[in-house]
């Protein structure tokens, strides 16, 4: 569980400390890469809460998602079609699905802990 959080903290820190500007022709690639990274991070948190987290799956999924997203955007540029929008849609849907599962999981655990406290008292 510490690997996703460490990556997020390091990424935010490096992004805030550097004055790096991205050219506009790379904005589609960057948006997909950020969404792919967030999807992988949220998926890792979901897997941890469900007890199925595996670092190898997390790291390989991270790189596979980024490579797939960038390849899709690259192909779309050469075909003259905005294929990056398909990646944005897919990662966005998965992101919200994972967040919904995390929310349900946390609410279930919270409700069970409240019931257990009432039964003890």
UniProtKB/Swiss-Prot annotation:
It is found in: Cell membrane. One of its GO terms (cellular component) is plasma membrane. It is a multi-pass membrane protein. Pfam families: DUF1290. It comes from the Bacteria. The chain crosses the membrane at residues 2-22, 29-49, 57-77. Keywords: Cell membrane, Membrane, Transmembrane, Transmembrane helix. Belongs to the sbp family. This is Small basic protein.
């Amino acid at each position: 569980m510490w690997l996703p959080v460490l990556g997020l903290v390091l990424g935010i820190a490096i992004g805030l400390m550097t004055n790096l500007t991205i050219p506009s022709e790379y904005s589609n690639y960057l948006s997909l890469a950020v969404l792919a990274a967030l999807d992988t991070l949220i998926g890792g948190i979901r897997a941890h809460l469900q007890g199925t987290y595996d670092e190898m799956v997390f790291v390989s999924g991270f790189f596979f998602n980024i490579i797939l997203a960038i390849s899709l955007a690259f192909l779309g540029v050469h075909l003259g079609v905005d294929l990056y929008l398909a990646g944005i849609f897919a990662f966005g849907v998965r992101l919200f699905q994972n967040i919904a599962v995390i929310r349900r999981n946390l609410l279930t655990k919270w409700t069970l802990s409240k019931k257990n406290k009432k039964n003890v008292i």
